[in-house]
């Protein structure tokens, strides 16, 4: 079953909508440059009200490992998603008590060996592949070319579990799951009416599309 993460949560009602619709994880963005920035107090309040078995994920771009540890503790985050290239092996290994998802954005000069080296050095087994953009670390709405995405997932299945992000929405997510077979999918702008404001119908449609293609693929097996 494909895991589903709804990212860029800023409101309690959006978190509850996503959780009740079947999302496996919710992302809370702490990057000061993000239009989906959420305060630690707001994130803490939303996370405290989540149903069991919905994993809260912290999105980090410029914070130090020590800041990440403190935010995870204070807010109740279960996973730290690291977006900056500055989060190398040394910084990652200073993050304690929280699982890590490391984001890679295949751009000019990118090699899948970067993922394999990072995994070997840190023991990290969670990855997210997002579309490259020099302007933003994520949530751009840009997509990864399907052949590139397929190659990334095929060449990293033996070292961990990876999510696909980048321009996914209710209209294209089923094709992405069918063609690429990611362990999970991640969306932010694809289920919004405005940055940080989720659309309940889009969230529900997105999750339904993933579950339907999962059923079709299972039946085909």
From Swiss-Prot:
Keywords: Amino-acid biosynthesis, Aromatic amino acid biosynthesis, Isomerase, Tryptophan biosynthesis. SUPFAM superfamilies: Ribulose-phoshate binding barrel. Pathway: Amino-acid biosynthesis; L-tryptophan biosynthesis; L-tryptophan from chorismate: step 3/5. It catalyses: N-(5-phospho-beta-D-ribosyl)anthranilate = 1-(2-carboxyphenylamino)-1-deoxy-D-ribulose 5-phosphate. InterPro entries: Aldolase_TIM (IPR013785), PRAI_dom (IPR001240), RibuloseP-bd_barrel (IPR011060), TrpF_fam (IPR044643). Its EC number is 5.3.1.24. GO terms for biological process: L-tryptophan biosynthetic process. It is an enzyme of class 5 (isomerase). CDD domains: PRAI. GO terms for molecular function: phosphoribosylanthranilate isomerase activity. Belongs to the TrpF family. PANTHER family: N-(5'-PHOSPHORIBOSYL)ANTHRANILATE ISOMERASE (PTHR42894:SF1). This is N-(5'-phosphoribosyl)anthranilate isomerase. The gene is trpF.
């Amino acid at each position: 079953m494909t895991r589903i993460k709804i990212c860029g949560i800023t409101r309690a009602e959006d978190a509850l909508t996503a959780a009740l619709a079947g999302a496996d994880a919710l992302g809370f963005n702490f990057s000061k440059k993000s239009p989906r920035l959420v305060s630690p107090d707001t994130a803490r309040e939303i996370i405290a009200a989540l149903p069991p078995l919905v994993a809260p994920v912290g999105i980090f771009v410029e914070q130090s490992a020590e800041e990440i540890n403190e935010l995870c503790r204070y807010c109740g985050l279960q996973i730290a998603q690291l977006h900056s290239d500055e989060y190398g092996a040394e910084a990652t290994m200073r993050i304690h008590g929280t699982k890590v998802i490391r984001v890679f954005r295949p751009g000019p000069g990118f090699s899948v060996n970067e993922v394999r080296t990072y995994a070997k050095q840190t023991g990290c087994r969670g990855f997210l592949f997002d579309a490259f953009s020099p302007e933003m670390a994520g949530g751009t709405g840009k997509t990864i070319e399907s052949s590139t995405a397929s190659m990334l997932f095929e060449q990293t299945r033996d070292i961990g579990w990876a999510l696909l992000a980048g321009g996914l929405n209710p209209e294209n997510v089923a094709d992405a799951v069918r063609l690429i077979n990611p362990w999970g999918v991640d969306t932010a702008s694809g289920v919004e009416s405005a940055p940080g404001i989720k659309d309940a119908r889009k969230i529900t449609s997105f999750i339904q599309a993933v579950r339907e293609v999962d059923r079709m693929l299972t039946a085909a097996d």
